[in-house]
Amino acid sequence: IFQYATAKIGAILVNVNPAYRTHELEYVVAQSGMRALLSATSYKTSQYRAMVETVAPKIASLEWVAFFDDESYDAILAAAAEVSEEQLRERSAGLSAADAINIQYTSGTTGFPKGATLSHRNILNNGFFVGEMLHYTQADRVCIPVPFYHCFGMVMGNLACTSHGSTMVIPAPTFEPAATMEAVAQERCTSLYGVPTMFIAELS
């Protein structure tokens, strides 16, 4: 939802790897000049609220923080109700295909994460031509268990489908082999995304 919402208003979406530790999150938030941060409070063993509350006071550019499962997220929805459709159309009409729309960061395994700034044209063309290469149509149902913070899920998955009218099937919040295979069977998927380790886990 936020991928499409930020694109519609011309905000730059900064993808954050949920496996980042506090120091990596701090670096990405500061280096990108992030003004707003939306996060889950926790997932499995990761305590995102604690990480964000440690980082936020140190970042001058960060104007507001919201968590999906508390009143701060409700405040976002309330603020959205104050924006008219006409205002949204005017904002969208002023955008250019060359505008920066997304910053994707590396994993940071060999140092601090490195950010790549991408435009509307960059990511939409990438997704479109992936869909063309795979001959996607409105009849296709694509299972996307790969992460959305990376190009594979966000661009080759979401935008390849969107640009061809194909159905996106999202089996679980993070990769779960059994849930993925169940989704493929139940939704009659025509494509399944993944990397070798994921396919090995699914075959096990």
Predicted regions and their residues:
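Conserved S/T- and glycine-rich ATP-binding loop of Class I adenylate-forming
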Residues: 6, 37, 100, 106-109, ...
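ATP-dependent adenylate-forming carboxylate-activation enzymes
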Residues: 11-29, 41-51, 166-187
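Adenylate-forming
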Residues: 39-53, 146, 189-204
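ANL superfamily adenylate-forming
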Residues: 43-97
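Conserved pre-ATP/AMP-binding loop-to-beta segment of ANL
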Residues: 67, 81-105, 112, 117, ...
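Conserved AMP-binding/adenylation subdomain of ANL enzymes
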Residues: 124-141, 151-191, 200
